Amino acid sequence: MGGWSSKPRKGMGTNLSVPNPLGFFPDHQLDPAFKANSENPDWDLNPHKDNWPDANKVGVGAFGPGFTPPHGGLLGWSPQAQGLLTTVPAAPPPASTNRQSGRQPTPFSPPLRDTHPQAMQWNSTTFLQTLQDSRVRALYLPAGGSSSGTVSPAQNTVSAISSISSKTGDPVPNMENIASGLLGHLLVLQAGFFSLTKILTIPQSLDSWWTSLNFLGGTPACPGQNSQSQISSHSPTCCPPICPGYRWMCLRRFIIFLCILLLCLIFLLVLLDYQGMLPVCPLTPGSTTTSTGPCKTCTTPAQGTSMFPSCCCTKPTDGNCTCIPIPSSWAFAKYLWGWASVRFSWLSLLVPFVQWFVGLSPTVWLSVIWMMWFWGPSLYNILRPFMPLLPTFFCLWVYI
């Protein structure tokens, strides 16, 4: 075994013309050492072998349709011998010489307003009559599974219109509206974040203004620094925690936060009172008490016309309601004054003084003019920290 010999051999494997696909017979070298490589594809060196020309053809064999058993070894070398399925593309049909034959493209249907202008009159009887036409009804009620496009006439007009309404589904969401809505939310979020950053600077600005009152005409400096604390010179509004003035800075900012919350609360109460949600009623003329009882309607109408909300008050004697048009600020001031007078009795002693001060109108006006003249140059610096709150209050006043 191992090479080819010209001497006749006897025994098993002497018929060298028999195909030897698995290499179990002599003189058929399968090992790559015997030139079974890609450089010598015809590695079966037997010159008397049967070339098995039919093996190169694709046919039906034991490996299924389109496969050919391997020849010359375990897999063979040609694509057909390796058992690969070779797909032969089918020849395309000949091109038609008559371009007019076959199905023609469907032409575009003209709009309804051009073919049936009377159908566009929805509020007239002409449309109801036109709807009986099968061609018009086919535009609204297409026949399912029918290629003719004709529809049996409706029994009545009401059922046809109801069928039209029943086939109308939910409207498709408009992407432009969705995008504009998202953009609006993003703008509101950006404006809110900008306002928040500005509002957070209010305590520091007010703290600077507060400390500047103690250093009129000079540069504010922290009085808590000394030679023993080993702290460099700094502003009293930026004291480090180890500075003795740090606790005073925290106290000032806490008071400022309370004042801001009180301002927001006052604005909210004024807004609720303006909307009529606050049960605040002034004293009814000629009476000493007032209440907001279960009276639903006013028996005595309000005198005159006023854009301010009316306050409906009841008299404990007869239970009649009296509507008095009052401004919200006046009602709110009366509410705060009544609430404070109950808890602080000493406020009643200030009433004569306030009445006397209000009666001196020339003096009051002169005092206001003098204060504006004195505080005028620095009035903007005083009110500047409250500027971010003004748009917020305005939006709440308009939209609530």
UniProtKB/Swiss-Prot annotation:
Domain topic, free-text comment: The large envelope protein is synthesized with the pre-S region at the cytosolic side of the endoplasmic reticulum and, hence will be within the virion after budding. Therefore the pre-S region is not N-glycosylated. Later a post-translational translocation of N-terminal pre-S and TM1 domains occur in about 50% of proteins at the virion surface. These molecules change their topology by an unknown mechanism, resulting in exposure of pre-S region at virion surface.
Region annotation Pre-S1: where it falls in the sequence: 2-119
In the record, biological process GO terms are:
caveolin-mediated endocytosis of virus by host cell; fusion of virus membrane with host endosome membrane; virion attachment to host cell
Recount the biotech application: Systematic vaccination of individuals at risk of exposure to the virus has been the main method of controlling the morbidity and mortality associated with hepatitis B. The first hepatitis B vaccine was manufactured by the purification and inactivation of HBsAg obtained from the plasma of chronic hepatitis B virus carriers. The vaccine is now produced by recombinant DNA techniques and expression of the S isoform in yeast cells. The pre-S region do not seem to induce strong enough antigenic response.
What does the entry's PTM section describe? Isoform M is N-terminally acetylated by host at a ratio of 90%, and N-glycosylated by host at the pre-S2 region. Myristoylated; this modification is essential for its interaction with the host protein SLC10A1/NTCP.
Please list where the region (Pre-S) is annotated: 2-174
Keyword Mitochondrion, does the record have it? Answer: no
User: Where in the sequence does UniProt note compositional bias of the Polar residues kind?
Assistant: 96-106
**Virion surface topological domain:** 2-181, 275-348, 399-400
Cellular localization per UniProt: Virion membrane
- Return the protein name: Large envelope protein
